[in-house]
């Protein structure tokens, strides 16, 4: 099935979470804010005016575009993973784009990796297994493959311990929130004083354990120190390729309440 997907739109979608946060804070972003966001994410301004840039930004949040974002979230994560390790070029996901109409046609999830110009799904899985020593089943659904890649990759990086934090990734990809459990309290106690501990303690019911582990990972890699604000949290997350689901869990699942809490933390 032919589908359209533009490089620029891919970048806009990658940036859509912080853009969404910006729009939540201000329903009518100024032209300068729009240009700043476009340049911040490395988007070359191909338009001739700020008005055109405004149209590009706002077009990314049309109802139909948001529907497309939900449809492609599975391929988005897998595409980032494959690109990161040069298993599959991201360009294989991009074809025939009609910018004026925001024409984006997306295959059903089961067909997302049936690419015309690349290896088939079984070949891709075989490459991943050889490269990382994984044991991915070629007959699994794409969503299951995605979960297995993420959980096995995190375990390889020693980011999670299945004996002390249970379980980070569920098969159905449900959020894990353990506000009253021994494991969760122990986890908080081990990391008291860190900036993500402050995030968790604002409202523990709003944050899942995956997010805590991910924040811990970022703080280690970039030696992040207190205080740090929501803008910086977003920026650091976007330097990591394997970020899509974690960002989704933070900025979509808990939405406005957590954004406001993050803003309050910035002022601590």
Q: What is the role of each PLM region?
A:
Residues 1-268:
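N-terminal domain-start signal
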């Amino acid at each position: 099935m032919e589908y359209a997907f533009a490089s620029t739109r891919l970048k806009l979608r990658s940036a859509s979470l912080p853009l969404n946060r910006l729009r939540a804070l201000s329903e009518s972003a100024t032209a300068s804010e729009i240009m700043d966001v476009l340049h911040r994410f490395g988007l070359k301004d191909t338009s001739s005016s700020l008005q055109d840039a405004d149209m590009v930004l706002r077009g990314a949040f049309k109802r139909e575009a948001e529907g497309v974002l939900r449809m492609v979230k599975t391929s988005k994560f897998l595409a980032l993973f494959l690109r990161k390790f040069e298993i599959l070029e991201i360009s294989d996901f991009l074809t025939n784009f009609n910018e004026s109409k925001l024409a984006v046609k997306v295959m059903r999830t089961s067909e997302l990796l049936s690419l015309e110009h690349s290896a088939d799904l079984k070949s891709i899985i075989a490459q991943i297994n050889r490269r990382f020593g994984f044991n991915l089943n070629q007959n699994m659904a794409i969503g299951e493959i995605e979960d297995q890649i993420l959980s096995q990759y995190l375990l390889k990086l020693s980011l999670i311990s299945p004996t002390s934090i249970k379980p980070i990734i569920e098969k159905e990809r449900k959020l894990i929130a353990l506000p009253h459990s021994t494991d969760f309290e122990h986890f908080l106690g081990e990391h008291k004083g860190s900036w993500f501990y402050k995030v968790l303690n604002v409202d523990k019911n709003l944050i899942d354990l995956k997010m805590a582990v991910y924040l811990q990972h970022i703080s280690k890699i970039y030696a992040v120190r207190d205080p740090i604000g929501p803008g910086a949290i977003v920026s650091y997350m976007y330097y990591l390729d394997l970020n899509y689901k974690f960002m989704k869990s933070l900025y979509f699942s808990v939405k406005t309440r957590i954004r406001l809490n993050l803003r309050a933390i910035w002022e601590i």
